[in-house]
Amino acid sequence: MRDEQLMASERVAVHELPTPLGFWHWSGKVYGERSQDWLDVQSQGGNVNLALLLHHLDLLGIPVDLTDLQPALVQTEAVLLPWRTLRQQAKSRLGTEEYQTMLAHELELERLQQGVLLQTLRTLALFRGDSRNLFHYLSLLGAQQGPLRDLIC
């Protein structure tokens, strides 16, 4: 009985998780403060939205298994990555307005990806505990000694 009470007290309720809009705004602020550092994660093969989510979960003390979030990434990266590549390749051939339109669409795809990650997160049984999500992710990328190391909780 005591173990059940302990488990119930440590379990994270869905309402404690970030909302899509709240997380989008938080991500924009955190990303904007150190955009180049977050882009370094991307250049090392990582996903910025995932890294931001893992950092946010660390701040909340919620550990998560990266493999549980992988399907959401696979689903959204199938659309996002080709669009990003197309935008980058077209940059020199487009006028400012056309390029900004492509960039705005990419940001909408980024927002969609965040929403899918959060939706996936809401389906998981999450518990409070020692959360080193960002550290583990950066370690997988070989980037744990990079510019974001000070964010590791």
Predicted feature descriptions by range:
Residues 40-43, 63-79, 129-133, 153:
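Short alpha-helical "patches" and their helix-cap loops
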Residues 20-23, 46-50, 114, 131-134:
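Short runs of predominantly hydrophobic/aromatic residues within well-ordered alpha helices
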Residues 2-32, 78-88, 110:
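An acidic intrinsically disordered interaction segment
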Residues 39, 54, 87-88, 118-122:
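Amphipathic alpha-helical segments within well-ordered protein domains
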Residues 2-23, 62-65, 96-106, 121-129:
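Contiguous interface-forming segments/domains that mediate binding rather than catalysis
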Residues 60-117:
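Structured binding/interaction patches within domain cores
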Residues 92-153:
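A charged, amphipathic interaction segment
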Residues 32-70:
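N-terminal interaction modules that seed assembly of large macromolecular complexes
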